[in-house]
Amino acid sequence: SSAASDVYKRQLHYGDVPAFTPERWDFTITGLVAHPQRWTYEQFSKLPHVTETYDIHCVTGWSKLDNTWEGVRVRDLLRPATVLPKGQFVMVHGDEDYTTNVPLSLLLQEGALIANKHNGEPLTPEHGWPYRLVVPGPYFWKSAKWVRGLELMETNERGFWERYGYHNDGDPWKEERYSWQER
């Protein structure tokens, strides 16, 4: 096994792994939308799932190339919600009050998924089961585990790690790791 795959097996999250109860799980789209959306786990798991392949980059310095993800396209989830013109930013909400912020434009990319499989296998609880956000481009902390909802917002408010000193954008090609690097 490669060093990158060994690193991927380590704990790379804050706090405990949330317990998953299918009857209590839901996924919502709220905020600056004309039609807020809510799916139960059963409903969400029946939505069309697609496969995308891209690299992931961790803020700690490692990358894992050619990852295949299976899940629901974020832009397909946003379509029935009808994002209002002022809703240009998204607060991604996960279990345990975890949040991360991304521009709406990143989630409208074809590759942005709410994923339940990685490299053909169901996600493990440690890696976000039953669903995690995966966004091609930024450092992987922006791809929130245990994702439960998207809140459309007018302003780019900071999420959990961004409030604790991580860069607001997290572009690995610009090495945007820390908030002190912001201009």
Predicted regions, residues:
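Short, small-residue-biased leader/transition segments that mark boundaries at the very start
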Residues: 1-8
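N-terminal post-signal-peptidase region of extra-cytosolic proteins
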Residues: 10-14
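A glycine-rich, hydrophobic loop/mini-helix early in the fold
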Residues: 17-68
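Extracellular structured ligand-interaction cores
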Residues: 24-26, 53, 71, 87-89, ...
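Mid-length scaffold segments of soluble, non-membrane domains
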Residues: 50-102
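Active-site scaffold segments
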Residues: 73, 113-117, 122-155
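A contiguous pocket-lining binding segment that forms or flanks enzyme active sites
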Residues: 86-122, 132
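Low-complexity, Gly/Ser/Thr/Pro-rich intrinsically disordered linker/tail segments
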Residues: 150-151, 156-183
